[in-house]
UniProtKB/Swiss-Prot annotation:
HAMAP family: MOC2B. It is found in: Cytoplasm, Cytosol. Pathway: Cofactor biosynthesis; molybdopterin biosynthesis. The modification Phosphoserine is found at residue 20. Belongs to the MoaE family. MOCS2B subfamily. The gene is MOCS2. SUPFAM superfamilies: Molybdopterin synthase subunit MoaE. The lineage of its organism: Eukaryota, Metazoa, Chordata, Craniata, Vertebrata. This is Molybdopterin synthase catalytic subunit. One of its GO terms (cellular component) is cytosol. GO terms for biological process: Mo-molybdopterin cofactor biosynthetic process.
Length: 172
């Protein structure tokens, strides 16, 4: 049984990485610039507790926004053992009204602390602290060490942006 949590501080539809493999194959969703400009998006929180199999792609689509530049995700899975015992499955229960209320409070706390556009939280079980620390390290280290530039393309012009967090870009 897999589980998943996804929060978003957005996604930029103009990002093009021609040498990279696509994240979602055969994606039929390609909004036009007109559609993107006309959309006034309100922030949303999507909360779901389910016993059904979860799809990273489906949940990711819930948090994509043309106003933002990234989607942050955490995917938790079930370990195959615990304290030397083989785990074959998990069963879980929740008092849904209370669980949903508590997750809404968490979403509210997130919005007070960070500029997040959309949040989707799908119920998960398991330990996540080490995984989240590893993801944070990967992102911070990538930004500090990997020479990546982006080109922002506007309606009338474009501009190359260097990674200000990279050690080689600092003004010493």
């Amino acid at each position: 049984m897999s589980s998943l949590e996804i929060s978003s501080s957005c996604f930029n539809l103009e990002t093009k990485l021609p040498l990279s493999p696509p994240l979602v194959e055969d994606s039929a969703f390609e909004p036009s610039r007109k559609d993107m400009d006309e959309v006034e998006e309100k922030s949303k929180d999507v909360i779901n507790f389910t016993a059904e199999k979860l799809s990273v792609d489906e949940v990711s689509q819930l948090v994509i926004s043309p106003l933002c530049g990234a989607i942050s995700l955490f995917v938790g899975t079930t370990r195959n053992n615990f304290e030397g015992k083989k785990v074959i499955s998990l069963e879980y229960e929740a008092y849904l009204p209370m669980a949903e209320n508590e997750v809404r409070k968490i979403c509210s706390d997130i919005r007070q602390k960070w500029p997040v556009k959309h949040i989707a939280v799908f119920h998960r079980l398991g330990h996540r602290a080490a995984s989240l620390e590893a993801v944070s390290y990967a992102i911070d280290t990538l930004k500090a060490k990997v020479p990546i530039w982006k080109k922002e393309i506007y309606e009338e012009s474009s501009s190359w942006k260097g990674n200000k967090e990279c050690f080689w870009a600092s003004n010493n």
